């Protein structure tokens, strides 16, 4: 879990900005989106191979 300490003279806006940046770097939102719906292992493999194919031909 990402957490920050708010300084004495720090505004809530800047603390919130730091928290959002820390969450983005940790990949929290992408992980939530990925786990939002169950994905069968066969579908995961298919997506992974299609992504590899796109990278190869790009």
UniProtKB/Swiss-Prot annotation:
Source species: Clostridium kluyveri (strain ATCC 8527 / DSM 555 / NBRC 12016 / NCIMB 10680 / K1)
Keywords annotated in UniProt: Ribonucleoprotein, Ribosomal protein
Segments of this protein annotated with the region Disordered: 36-58
NCBIfam families membership: S21p
GO CC, alphabetical: ribonucleoprotein complex; ribosome
Protein name as it appears in the record: Small ribosomal subunit protein bS21
GO biological process, one term: translation
Compositional bias annotation for Basic residues: 43-58
Family label: Belongs to the bacterial ribosomal protein bS21 family.
Gene: rpsU
Single GO MF annotation: structural constituent of ribosome
